[in-house]
């Protein structure tokens, strides 16, 4: 669809603060509590993570805990985690989240419609939500574990054509980790037309560096793992993660 050469080139290396500025952390599992959201906000602000996401009912609380105008954005999920909600329901949820202070939204794509080949429905849904919440950016989650390679290509193309800011690999609700092989399918499809967020099973600096070389510009990482990775980056020679070569 798009020439891969149009992708933004990654930096040669990252300092710990630069790494944190590429990572979203979240408390979006069903069991997460108010205390978890408060802890999330504290960690996100202290460490300089680019975004903190909470389930919709906790977004107003999260917004109140994260200083406006700081390094950390507040986000929330739409149609989460199945993606099977109606377009009207998803749109209403997205608008409410934006009104409650969410600065970016991660929406689950309608996997069933993708697998049914109903691409027009999916395209129209994404466009409707993008328009309803503008200028708040929308990331669209594919949940790669549920899609074939051809479905990944088709879904990625739809996202790139629909005005979303990012295509995202997964919700973190499935056990499958994001792989370089699956990411390549997305990159080959979207080129530089849309940014890519990798989420799910990312646990090493080597994985981050490899994904950045492919074109990934944002990561969704378990909170404690994210903190540990920033610490590991600081402990590398020169205190920087080498993206051009290998980590450490």
UniProtKB/Swiss-Prot annotation:
Checking CDD domains in the record gives:
DeoC (cd00959)
- What does the UniProt entry say about where the protein is found? Cytoplasm
Residues the record marks as active site: 106, 168, 197
- Among its keywords, does the record have Lyase? yes
Q: Which GO terms describe its biological process?
A: 2-deoxyribose 1-phosphate catabolic process; carbohydrate catabolic process; deoxyribonucleotide catabolic process
* Any one GO molecular-function label of the UniProt entry: deoxyribose-phosphate aldolase activity
Keyword annotations of the record: Cytoplasm, Lyase, Schiff base
Concerning SMART domains, the annotation shows: DeoC
Q: What is its EC number?
A: 4.1.2.4
The reaction(s) catalysed by this protein are: 2-deoxy-D-ribose 5-phosphate = D-glyceraldehyde 3-phosphate + acetaldehyde
Identify the InterPro entries for this entry.
Aldolase_TIM (IPR013785), DeoC (IPR011343), DeoC/FbaB/LacD_aldolase (IPR002915), DeoC_typeI (IPR028581)
**Record's GO cellular component, any one?**
cytoplasm
The EC category is lyase
Q: Please give the superkingdom of this protein's source.
A: Bacteria
Q: Its annotated pathway?
A: Carbohydrate degradation; 2-deoxy-D-ribose 1-phosphate degradation; D-glyceraldehyde 3-phosphate and acetaldehyde from 2-deoxy-alpha-D-ribose 1-phosphate: step 2/2
Question: In the UniProt record, does the keyword Zinc occur?
Answer: no
Q: Name one Pfam family in it.
A: DeoC
Give the main localization category: cytoplasm
User: Sorted alphabetically, which PANTHER family does this protein's record hold?
Assistant: DEOXYRIBOSE-PHOSPHATE ALDOLASE
Similarity comment: Belongs to the DeoC/FbaB aldolase family. DeoC type 1 subfamily.
| Function text | Catalyzes a reversible aldol reaction between acetaldehyde and D-glyceraldehyde 3-phosphate to generate 2-deoxy-D-ribose 5-phosphate.
- Please give the name of this protein: Deoxyribose-phosphate aldolase
Q: Which organism does this sequence originate in?
A: Rhizobium meliloti (strain 1021)
